[in-house]
Amino acid sequence: MRQIAFYGKGGIGKSTTQQNTMAAMAEMGRRVMIVGCDPKADSTRLILHSKAQTSVIQLAAEKGSVEDLELDEVLVEGQWGIKCVESGGPEPGVGCAGRGVITSITYLEEAGAYENLDFVTYDVLGDVVCGGFAMPIRQGKAQEIYIVTSGEMMAMYAANNIARGVLKYAHSGGVRLGGLICNSRNTDREDELIIELARRLNTQMIHFIPRNNVVQHAELRRMTVIEYDPENSQANEYRQLAKKIDENDMKTIPTPISMDELEELLIEFGIMEQEDESIIGQKANATVA
């Protein structure tokens, strides 16, 4: 069994990418379980055709404790037999959402949820690299990390930060970076930029997912593209990504870069302009003058 985690900046399309890729993986005959590690509990909605799966934390609150739960209450089977679990989190502003991740994974292990599987995937809130959300990395639950990014500055900044988190636990926990997934935003020279970022991080761009409106059309129906329009070229992109992950033997210890290096890379590719130190702190009317 391989345990992999998808990390990435909020709003990058991480959950959508993960669900479509795992749908393709299940279509290939792999036995898959998705564990949502995001308080939004939206990591399984396209597989289950639901708004949000009832989370382990919600069910535990209703029952009194996690120990009172039955596995079939928290684990729901969706399309292609994909097993789905949402860890959930507390009400906004109260408590630590990362605790929900820790509680859920511990419960699933003790309840025998990991038996007879080929892949377990963790869909993790990515720009908050706190202890709870880093738990799949920190305790060696996820051995392979895939970072969903794009050619936008903040997505790349988050990817570099996540690489730092992987590096921190690479020697103690054995976690490795499996690659960057570029979920295209149609920015200039995007594929070249992410290939170069991957090179500097000592990894690969494992796949470039082109932008396609069919993804949004499928999401409106709470479906993966694999199910909604299986003959669409975008469905084949996710199938290619699933095959690449299934066959991936490039798992590395990342080499995160400094903020200065990241900015230099963005300037080199024309994403950022070279700063003119003389204009820093100047108001609009002063610059015009």
From Swiss-Prot:
EC number: 1.18.6.1
UniProt-annotated binding residues for ATP: 8-15
The keyword Ubl conjugation appears for this protein: no
UniProt PTM: The reversible ADP-ribosylation of Arg-99 inactivates the nitrogenase reductase and regulates nitrogenase activity.
Top-rank taxon: Bacteria
Chain positions with ADP-ribosylarginine modification: 99
Binding site for [4Fe-4S] cluster: 96, 130
Any one biological process term the GO annotation gives: nitrogen fixation
PROSITE patterns (alphabetical): NIFH_FRXC_1 (PS00746), NIFH_FRXC_2 (PS00692), NIFH_FRXC_3 (PS51026)
Reactions performed catalytically: N2 + 8 reduced [2Fe-2S]-[ferredoxin] + 16 ATP + 16 H2O = H2 + 8 oxidized [2Fe-2S]-[ferredoxin] + 2 NH4(+) + 16 ADP + 16 phosphate + 6 H(+)
Cofactor(s) the protein needs: [4Fe-4S] cluster
Keywords from the UniProt entry: 4Fe-4S, ADP-ribosylation, ATP-binding, Iron, Iron-sulfur, Metal-binding, Nitrogen fixation, Nucleotide-binding, Oxidoreductase
One Gene Ontology term of the molecular function aspect: nitrogenase activity
Cofactor: record remark: Binds 1 [4Fe-4S] cluster per dimer.
Keyword NADP tagged: no
InterPro entries: NifH/chlL_CS, NifH/frxC, Nitrogenase_Fe_NifH, P-loop_NTPase
Subunit annotation: Homodimer.
PANTHER family: LIGHT-INDEPENDENT PROTOCHLOROPHYLLIDE REDUCTASE IRON-SULFUR ATP-BINDING PROTEIN (PTHR42864:SF2)
Family: Belongs to the NifH/BchL/ChlL family.
Entry function: The key enzymatic reactions in nitrogen fixation are catalyzed by the nitrogenase complex, which has 2 components: the iron protein and the molybdenum-iron protein.
Name of protein: Nitrogenase iron protein
Gene symbol of the encoding locus: nifH
